[in-house]
Amino acid sequence: MVNQSKPEVAIFGGSFDPPHKGHQQIVRKAVQILDIDKLIVLPAYLNPFKNVSLANPEKRLEWCYQLFDGIPKVVVDDYEIRQNKSVRTSQSVKHFNNTYSVKYLIIGSDNLSTLTKWHEFKWLNDHITWVIVTRKGHPVQTEGLKSWRILEIDFPISSTTIREKKDLRYIDNKIKQSVEKTIKDKKE
C-alpha cells in the first residue's frame, strides 16, 4: 500500500510591513534546517496585536511574492488576506492542516511574552513545534512550550524600525522602490 501522508510544512506568518532581508534569511535558513516539504509565508490581513500599518494587505502580499519568489520550497499564500479580517493563527493552522501536515510555526522571540495570550494557545502548543527566531533584546524564554527549536538569526533591524526610521538599507532591491514610494506617500 502506498503511503498517502500529507506534505509536512512550516508556516511563517507575519505582517511583513515591509518584508526585508531578515525575513529572507529566516526563510532560507528554515528551509535548510527543518525537515519540511514546503514553507508557507503567510502575510496577515491585520495583526491583532498591532494597530499601525505602512502598507495595505494587497501591497504587502505583492512585496512578499516578489521577495520570496525563486526560493526553493517556499510559497507565499494569501489565505489570511482573502479573509478580509484579522485571522487567528490557530484558524490558519487548521485551514492548512486540511491539505498539509503543519509541523512548525515560525515566530520571532519578541512574540514569546504574549504567546500564551494567543487564541487557542494550548491547542497550538499541542499540535505544532515552535520555531523561535532570535531577536536582539528579546530573550528566548521557552517555559510552557511543549516542543520548540531555535533558529539563530543575527539581523540588526525590524520592520518597525524600517517604518519609523525610513531606513531602506535592509530592503531587497526587488521591492525597494515600491517600499520607498509607499513610505513617501504615507507621509503626505
Swiss-Prot record:
<keyword id="KW-0067">ATP-binding</keyword>
<dbReference type="InterPro" id="IPR014729">
    <property type="entry name" value="Rossmann-like_a/b/a_fold"/>
</dbReference>
<dbReference type="GO" id="GO:0009435">
    <property type="term" value="P:NAD biosynthetic process"/>
</dbReference>
<dbReference type="GO" id="GO:0004515">
    <property type="term" value="F:nicotinate-nucleotide adenylyltransferase activity"/>
</dbReference>
<keyword id="KW-0548">Nucleotidyltransferase</keyword>
<comment type="pathway">
    <text>Cofactor biosynthesis; NAD(+) biosynthesis; deamido-NAD(+) from nicotinate D-ribonucleotide: step 1/1.</text>
</comment>
<keyword id="KW-0547">Nucleotide-binding</keyword>
<keyword id="KW-0520">NAD</keyword>
<comment type="similarity">
    <text>Belongs to the NadD family.</text>
</comment>
<dbReference type="GO" id="GO:0005524">
    <property type="term" value="F:ATP binding"/>
</dbReference>
<dbReference type="InterPro" id="IPR005248">
    <property type="entry name" value="NadD/NMNAT"/>
</dbReference>
<keyword id="KW-0662">Pyridine nucleotide biosynthesis</keyword>
<dbReference type="Pfam" id="PF01467">
    <property type="entry name" value="CTP_transf_like"/>
</dbReference>
<dbReference type="InterPro" id="IPR004821">
    <property type="entry name" value="Cyt_trans-like"/>
</dbReference>
<protein>
    <recommendedName>
        <fullName>Probable nicotinate-nucleotide adenylyltransferase</fullName>
        <ecNumber>2.7.7.18</ecNumber>
    </recommendedName>
</protein>
<keyword id="KW-0808">Transferase</keyword>
<comment type="function">
    <text>Catalyzes the reversible adenylation of nicotinate mononucleotide (NaMN) to nicotinic acid adenine dinucleotide (NaAD).</text>
</comment>
